[in-house]
Amino acid sequence: MAPVEDGGGVEFPVGMKVLVVDDDPTCLAVLKRMLLECRYDATTCSQATRALTMLRENRRGFDVIISDVHMPDMDGFRLLELVGLEMDLPVIMMSADSRTDIVMKGIKHGACDYLIKPVRMEELKNIWQHVIRKKFNENKEHEHSGSLDDTDRTRPTNNDNEYASSANDGAEGSWKSQKKKRDKDDDDGELESGDPSSTSKKPRVVWSVELHQQFVNAVNHLGIDKAVPKKILELMNVPGLTRENVASHLQKFRLYLKRIAQHHAGIANPFCPPASSGKVGSLGGLDFQALAASGQIPPQALAALQDELLGRPTNSLVLPGRDQSSLRLAAVKGNKPHGEREIAFGQPIYKCQNNAYGAFPQSSPAVGGMPSFSAWPNNKLGMADSTGTLGGMSNSQNSNIVLHELQQQPDAMLSGTLHSLDVKPSGIVMPSQSLNTFSASEGLSPNQNTLMIPAQSSGFLAAMPPSMKHEPVLATSQPSSSLLGGIDLVNQASTSQPLISAHGGGNLSGLVNRNPNVVPSQGISTFHTPNNPYLVSPNSMGMGSKQPPGVLKTENSDALNHSYGYLGGSNPPMDSGLLSSQSKNTQFGLLGQDDITGSWSPLPNVDSYGNTVGLSHPGSSSSSFQSSNVALGKLPDQGRGKNHGFVGKGTCIPSRFAVDEIESPTNNLSHSIGSSGDIMSPDIFGFSGQM
């Protein structure tokens, strides 16, 4: 029985035809029993495809449809779309899924209601409202389409009456007439899509699957924007089909497409937010603008760093280092008897000449905001090449090296000529791994305020006694057991310092020069091993240049002839009472045999051919040291007339840090050497009276 439109009849909604679609037979049985209690005419179906067939065969056989959302053969939303396009019946969705997004999806697809399982009796009693609402909307549309011709015929008369009313009634009547005119114009605009010639109701057309497919083909042929009812009707060419039928179906089809587009847009937006083209404010955790404004980094270095981080090719190179720890020590100031003599750690960025360095390992793409660099090649440092290239790259490439932080890189080694660099006072120089691999025509000459720290560990600086922080320190890159091996380095402010030579645990000896204000005695000391005697000169640091070139023997030689030992004779005598032999085998920072005897004896200077040329330090004290078990390294055979790893004037210190090129104010210091190419400086190892 069809529902009564006014709702006042006693029989309504008795006999309202309801189609229930659900794959659960139990749910179907319960719903059918509840609908019968509400005095509805209920029909059940367990398959969505079969229900769609029943609707197409007998569209007027049902007033409302109740469908489950999740079904195996067809989704409930798909059934909702097909029913909305073909039959235009009210559809109520039901499901045990009460999520808001699922309910919203059903409403967007055109469902008039959404019931949550288990369905209550009160909800089923009120489903007739959707049927009445649907019928009311259809009747309203037909009334508007039927009164269109009457509106067109009465428009001139109404306009004349309005103008007459405005002339007779004054301003108030004019405002009312204009308002009525605007309302009628709006109504005319809304009714333009209808058929002007239709003055009576037309029979409803059942849009079957074949008819709807013809309609869709016609729309696709014309295009959704250019499809109009007249052209669609011509393309379909179906007898009995009117322009009004096509216009109504086209309107529903467009609404359906609009709902689908809105649904897909709403689903895609949370997962695909619009891409923002924000500018890169900082890279690698660095605020470039703040650095440039505070003057901590020059504009050229800023541009080079930005280019490197952004992956653009540039001649500048940034060396952030392997680890992100930097050498941050406070500036330590010492006495200044000869001018500027302070060593500052954590200084600003050093720069060198454009042709000082060449190719470094190229940076890989940034990870975590900072560019990563490939591993440095573990090459030994050889300086036989004098063509001005470093690592295979010409000096003319003008690569500016910006040290972002002073960091330690154990595996990093530079290869090439470094003779164009001098060490700046208060600079920090990091030597390479092993100094016994030097091969150059010039020696190494650090200036008086130069600090050479081991490249292997930064613990050397932290463990440095306070007294050593006042003077320059020169140490090898290998861990020096003599610097950390139980030696008291506290300056006792005595008039003389005892003699000690440090020997490291690696291939090279540790090397420290402090240049105290009061120098030790003048005698040249010697300590012998079974094979190699070598000189130790107190208060010596630089290589003397007044003697003939020294001859360094190879591993098979029994002795090393030295020509570096001329020292001034103005030093005060040394208090030999400070020297004492030890009962334990702590000698030069190493543990040896207990057969150590100590004495002093003057040693003549010898030239490169073994001839005595004079005493370097005439004095009254005579003592010597004997040791049978001292670990001493030997130099490889590098040829005659070359200084293997010695420190001399006019050369540079190999370092992975770039420093400014400047001449040292002090160049007249003397040197003495050991068998492994290290400078033995006795005046800086103070031990409180014992060795």
Curated annotation (Swiss-Prot):
Q: One GO BP annotation here?
A: cytokinin-activated signaling pathway
- As stated in the Swiss-Prot or TrEMBL entry, residues carrying the post-translational modification 4-aspartylphosphate are D68
Compositional bias ranges of the Basic and acidic residues kind: 139-155
Domain of life the protein comes from: Eukaryota
Predominant place of localization: nucleus
Q: Which residues bind DNA?
A: 199-258
User: Any keyword Calcium?
Assistant: no
Describe the inactivation phenotype: Dwarf, narrow leaf, lesion mimic, low tillering and late heading phenotypes.
Q: Does the keyword Transcription regulation apply?
A: yes
Q: How is it modified after translation?
A: Two-component system major event consists of a His-to-Asp phosphorelay between a sensor histidine kinase (HK) and a response regulator (RR). In plants, the His-to-Asp phosphorelay involves an additional intermediate named Histidine-containing phosphotransfer protein (HPt). This multistep phosphorelay consists of a His-Asp-His-Asp sequential transfer of a phosphate group between first a His and an Asp of the HK protein, followed by the transfer to a conserved His of the HPt protein and finally the transfer to an Asp in the receiver domain of the RR protein.
What the entry lists under PROSITE patterns is as follows: HTH_MYB, RESPONSE_REGULATORY
Entry keywords, A to Z: Activator, Cytokinin signaling pathway, DNA-binding, Nucleus, Phosphoprotein, Transcription, Transcription regulation, Two-component regulatory system
Give one GO molecular function term.
DNA binding
Query: What residue stretches are annotated with the Response regulatory domain?
Result: 17-132
Location of region: Disordered: 139-204
Q: Which PANTHER family match?
A: TWO-COMPONENT RESPONSE REGULATOR, TWO-COMPONENT RESPONSE REGULATOR ARR2
By sequence similarity, the record places it as follows: Belongs to the ARR family. Type-B subfamily.
Name by which UniProt lists this protein: Two-component response regulator ORR21
**Species the sequence originates in:** Oryza sativa subsp. japonica
